[in-house]
């Protein structure tokens, strides 16, 4: 049976809003542009659990000439997780329709443990048989190992998986392994892409 494998950030949830990024920058105590650069500089290592929450935020702090207290790290982590929880209504509608039609659904997302925990608590998480996060795999997209570990969890061959992700490099990496892959732009286009492969939402 075919699996529909969704990315989370930028697909199920909205990208971080300007307001959320501004709140994070203010909490960081540094200039917004410098904070933004440092936030992403170490993100992949944070996503794949090479850095824990304290090590990640202290790396960011060091770039800004600061050192964060435990309460400051807790607040930054809270703001960070919250910034990834605004769902895209069209995608949620697509997910509920696919689930109602009996399709098997899973998530593969690059995310640190705090964000993954927050996503698991969302009602939409209940539609997925598996929620797979890079922090648990200790490997992140677009690394082939990340996809291969996910296929093993799904007990699926690449040809049995349709993958949707907003990042072109992740889509390309999945395609190399043999998955049917689409770059996500908006829910109606994703619905049409899936329908062309015989996956219709109820």
Where do the model's predicted regions map?
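Hydrophobic residues in well-ordered beta-strands that form the structural core
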Residues: 14, 107-109, 183
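Short, charged helix-to-loop "capping" segments that act as catalytic/coupling loops
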Residues: 16, 81, 110, 114-118
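N-terminal helical cap/lid subdomain that shapes the substrate entry/recognition surface
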Residues: 1-93, 100
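Short, flexible loop segments at the rims of nucleotide/cofactor-binding pockets, characterized by
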Residues: 81-86, 109-110, 139
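Generic structural signal for small/hydrophobic residues in well-ordered secondary structure
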Residues: 7-10, 49, 98, 107, ...
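Conserved, well-ordered alpha-helix/loop/beta-strand core segments that scaffold catalytic motifs
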Residues: 103-104
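Asp-based, Mg2+/Mn2+-dependent phosphohydrolase catalytic module
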Residues: 1-2, 96-99, 112-202
